[in-house]
Amino acid sequence: MGLKRFKPVTPGRRFMVISDFSDITKTEPEKSLLAPLKKTGGRNHHGRVTVRHRGGGHKRRYRIIDFKRYDKAGIPAKVLAIEYDPNRSARIALLLYADGEKRYILAPKGVNVGDTLMSGPDAEIRPGNALPLEKIPVGTLVHNVEFTPGKGGQIARAAGTYCQIMAKEGNYALLRMPSGELRKVHIKCYATVGVVGNEDHKNEVHGKAGRVRWLGRRPHVRGVAMNPVDHPHGGGEGRGKGHHPTSPWGLPTKGYKTRRGKRPSDKFIVRRRNEA
């Protein structure tokens, strides 16, 4: 995959940098692996906004991704295609298993059409294969990591992300997360070897506001541009906040820790990300 730059024939093209989609081998998704996706506009079941700046965007259909893979242990799968997924930054790979079933997985870096992938404790250590952490050597880069055995991958699923296995102690493996946090994860949890593909996603530049709207993101209005009724920063003469920066609900921002004090998972965190 590469990046595509444009001549500044219009203001919107001047700084635009997008993917050239050269890694995509199939343009139409697999119908049996699609599901309808209803837009929420950032609202919950009460109709209240729970995530601001969401709404609109191009219509999408959800691609059903296999984040588990352990139920296909020992069954080889051939990579049929690398596809675009509008619901995530990573590409997805269409697999055809030897038993005839087709499934989508996150497309790892270095996996191409025609490759054969495996999952299970006896799988080879190579990009795209899924194994329990106890079977993966220390130092290996992995993605799509489970937090709870059997739940499916939850960590390192975005384009270009990975975790690194730093050590193994008893029933736990010590993983360095994409954030830099060191965390213990049970060795029975599955992970996929390698790095998530489409690494250049972080270098893309939308170039114009309209392209961001196509993605379903609405304008982010500054608090100082609002009225006092709408935001703690609102009102006043000029652009001053008048006090320490806060969120729209009055909580301090810019460095204020919002993580709940005592959580059951605290005992698995060896080093916080801000201490890395």
UniProtKB/Swiss-Prot annotation:
GO-annotated biological processes: cytoplasmic translation
Keywords, alphabetical: Ribonucleoprotein, Ribosomal protein, RNA-binding, rRNA-binding
InterPro entries, A to Z: NA-bd_OB-fold, Rib_uL2_dom2, Ribosomal_uL2, Ribosomal_uL2_bac/org-type, Ribosomal_uL2_C, Ribosomal_uL2_CS, Ribosomal_uL2_dom3, Ribosomal_uL2_RNA-bd_dom
GO cellular component, one term: large ribosomal subunit
Family indicated by similarity: Belongs to the universal ribosomal protein uL2 family.
NCBIfam families found in the cross-reference section: rplB_bact
HAMAP family: Ribosomal_uL2_B (MF_01320_B)
PANTHER family registered for this protein in UniProt: LARGE RIBOSOMAL SUBUNIT PROTEIN UL2M, RIBOSOMAL PROTEIN L2
Protein name: Large ribosomal subunit protein uL2
